[in-house]
A protein has these predicted regions:
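Positively charged, low-complexity intrinsically disordered leader regions
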Residues: 1-48, 52
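Active-site cofactor/substrate anionic-group-binding motifs, chiefly glycine-
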Residues: 48-94, 99
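Short, structured coil segments at secondary-structure junctions
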Residues: 61, 133-134, 195
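Residue-level detector of anion-binding/catalytic polar loops
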Residues: 64-65, 71-72, 106, 137, ...
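Short, ordered loop/turn segments at secondary-structure junctions
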Residues: 70-73, 112-114, 143-144, 204-206
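Anion-binding alpha/beta catalytic cores of soluble intermediary-metabolism enzymes, centered on
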Residues: 89, 97-98, 105-191
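Conserved small/polar residues in nucleotide/adenosyl-binding loops
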Residues: 227-234
Length: 236
């Protein structure tokens, strides 16, 4: 596996789960694997759980870790191609990526959707530039459309606690005061569709995910109107 950005990259899902359970039993079994290797974690957006768990996993593998918060302790980076560099961003991402690659062996990138251009978000412009220009294996710590680390962790948890061989898994969501990226539900749906679970997505009409992530899931619409939901929400 050269890069890890989606469920397809992981290969055989059962083998990946078996290895994950093996590592959970002995978290330091492969402590020599990362000796003299360096992970660089690059954050364009804030993180708590992903940052902590990924850094701890790298340390358990014996790796050195460099954490770089873009725009917070590092130069602001221009990410648009073809722009005139006369603004408040003194360096371009395409110049910075090869430099980053020189100082590490593996790169993790966290870069959310910007809600400015859906095509750019769904093309994973920033993540793909790291894959193309870093010269290093790259994994996603949440990108514009997917969050594979969280989805794999969700799958591991379901496997650990399921009561039947083929459990029913339901995904839904509730109103939020501000727009949120769809990376987490997109990714969760993609991973659930890679299993034989009875996977159901339910939500009010008009809140659909992109069909390529819905896949073979059964979609059910809540018959209660969105207005009714909001009215009920205010009484809680």
């Amino acid at each position: 596996m050269k890069n890890f950005t989606c469920v397809q990259d992981i290969g055989n899902l059962k083998s990946a789960l078996d290895e994950a359970f093996e590592i959970k039993k002995d978290r330091f079994k492969y402590v020599e694997l990362g000796r003299n290797k360096t992970l660089m974690m690059i954050f364009f957006n804030s993180s708590l759980r992903t940052r902590l768990s990924t850094q701890k996993a790298a340390l358990n593998l014996g790796m050195n870790v460099i954490v770089l918060d873009i725009n917070q302790g590092a130069w602001k980076l221009e990410t648009e191609r073809g722009v005139i560099m006369d603004g408040d961003k003194p360096e371009h991402l395409l110049e910075a990526i090869p430099v980053m690659g020189c100082y590490c062996d593996v790169i993790g990138v966290r870069s959310f959707a910007r809600f400015e251009n859906k095509e750019d978000d769904y093309n994973e412009v920033i993540l793909e530039q790291f894959i193309k220009h870093s010269g290093r294996p790259v994994f996603s710590m949440e990108a514009a459309t997917r969050h594979p680390l969280q989805s794999f962790a969700d799958l591991i948890t379901i496997e650990e606690y399921k009561k039947t061989a083929r459990p029913k898994v339901v995904m839904t969501w509730a109103p939020h005061p501000r727009p949120l990226p769809q990376a987490v539900p997109n990714s969760f749906a993609e991973w659930m569709n890679a299993t034989d679970y009875d996977f159901v997505i339910t939500h009010p009409e008009g809140y659909e995910l992109d069909p390529k992530f819905v896949g073979n899931a059964r979609v059910e619409y809540d018959p209660v109107s969105y207005t009714h939901l909001r009215a009920h929400e205010t009484t809680l």
